[in-house]
From Swiss-Prot:
One of its GO terms (molecular function) is zinc ion binding. A zinc finger (C4-type) spans 327-346. PANTHER family: GENERAL TRANSCRIPTION FACTOR IIH SUBUNIT 3, TRANSCRIPTION INITIATION FACTOR IIH TFIIH , POLYPEPTIDE 3-RELATED. Keywords: DNA damage, DNA repair, Metal-binding, Nucleus, Transcription, Transcription regulation, Zinc, Zinc-finger. GO terms for biological process: nucleotide-excision repair; regulation of DNA-templated transcription; transcription initiation at RNA polymerase II promoter. The keyword Transcription applies. Belongs to the TFB4 family. This is General transcription and DNA repair factor IIH subunit TFB4. It comes from the Eukaryota.
């Protein structure tokens, strides 16, 4: 008994070493004007943008190596708000720090974020707010040229492309301590030219002692679009790509109705889907339900909706289908029978007899009400009308 008791109270160390892997958070904001106009009494897109910036800042504060990206899905197309490939943020921050008190009043008033904010927070917030204002001005000037269909699938493609680039090019990201070791080693190697051999050995030693960690990634979609104008095939293609890359797709759905296609994307990638009926407390929802890192999602019951609507889309009309026809060759889904008698996807020719039966409709026997004859006896006539 003593041996058993000793084994019970013996501390057994875990085999897995604790890790604090950096994470990439990509936010995709759908800025379709019609959808935001419908919920203007509940929340505005400016308030949503502020809540998302607080969410991004909180993500950056968890780990010094965390990365963020912000993409807007506009009627004119999808655009990167942060990072902007046309702008060098290091030069912008160095110019601001170098000028100091020499900034004139015009420059200080043009700043969208306070000067006392943390540098990384300020860079992200200013870039996102500046590009959002440009997008709003562009939308107001080009209302007639706006597209009727949603560009959310293109924004998802941009997010996955940027994620793939970060995971491949920066597949091993050094922690803060490792970066400090490399910086110190490089400074020592450049200090004197006579000690080249010594500096090279120190550089090699610093590289070997760095702790390299892998990056994880996730995507958050914020949309208030209630129209069924999202293309099914591009959304499913991006969903399967995210599933292969093991990138969860979280969805914060505003508005009145759920989005069946976004539900499928979130469910297939082990993401979180929430239909937020009261968006006034959006920041609380973002900081709780959508703050779960991908590394711990297998240990937590996700606060998502398990009742997923798996409706498909018609390949001819593009609308969602409850009951339709399926091609036996390529599994193409159709809500109507094509006039050419061929599959719109693979071009296979359908049998004319089967098409004639399908066009004729389904025959269902209908039982009429009983009629009374002259003697008072009931009789029923069974007919089979065509519907």
């Amino acid at each position: 008994m003593d041996a058993i008791a000793d084994s019970v109270f013996t501390d057994i160390g875990s085999s897995d070493s604790p890790s604090d892997d950096p994470s990439l958070l990509t936010v995709v904001l759908d800025v379709t004007p019609q959808s935001w106009y419908k919920i203007r009494n509940q929340i505005t897109i400016q308030e949503v943008a502020k809540s998302l910036l607080v969410f991004l800042n909180a993500h950056l504060s968890l780990n010094n190596s965390n990365q963020v990206a912000f993409i807007a899905s506009t009627p004119q197309g999808s655009k990167f708000l942060y990072p902007n490939p046309e702008k060098n943020y290091d030069e912008v921050s160095s110019k601001k720090n170098g000028e100091g008190s020499n900034l004139n009043k015009a420059d200080s008033t043009s700043s969208l974020v306070g000067d006392g904010m943390y540098r990384q927070f300020r860079i992200v917030d200013e870039a996102v707010l500046e590009k959002l204002n440009e997008i709003f001005a562009d939308i107001s000037q080009n209302v007639d040229k706006s597209r009727s269909n949603s560009t959310l699938s293109g924004a998802l493609s941009l997010a996955l492309t940027y994620t793939n680039r970060m995971l491949n090019l920066d597949s091993s990201i050094s922690t803060t301590t490792a970066s400090a070791i490399n910086t110190t080693t490089n400074a020592n190697s450049n200090k004197t030219s006579s000690s080249g051999t010594t500096s090279n050995s120190m550089s090699t030693g610093g590289t070997n002692t760095t702790s390299l960690t892998s990056m994880r990634s996730r995507i958050l979609i914020v949309s208030s679009n209630d129209d069924n104008d999202i293309k099914y095939i591009p959304i499913m293609n991006t969903t399967f790509a995210a599933q292969k890359m093991k990138v969860p797709i979280d969805v914060a759905k505003l508005g009145e109705r759920d989005s069946s296609y976004l539900q499928q994307a979130s469910d297939a990638t082990n993401g979180v889907y929430l239909h937020i009926a009261n968006p006034e407390g959006l920041i609380q929802t973002l900081s709780t339900a959508f703050f779960i890192e991908p590394s711990i999602r297998s240990l937590i019951i996700l606060p998502t909706n398990s009742n997923v609507n798996y409706r498909a889309s018609c390949f001819i009309t593009g609308k969602s289908v409850n009951l339709g026809f399926v091609c036996s060759v390529c599994l193409c889904i159709m809500s109507i029978i094509p006039k050419e008698g061929k599959c719109p996807t693979c071009g296979s020719k359908f049998d004319e007899k089967i098409l004639a039966q399908l066009r004729r409709g389904v025959v269902i026997p209908v039982k009429k009400k009983r009629k009374l004859d002259s003697n008072g006896n009931g009789q029923s006539d069974n007919v089979t009308p065509e519907i």
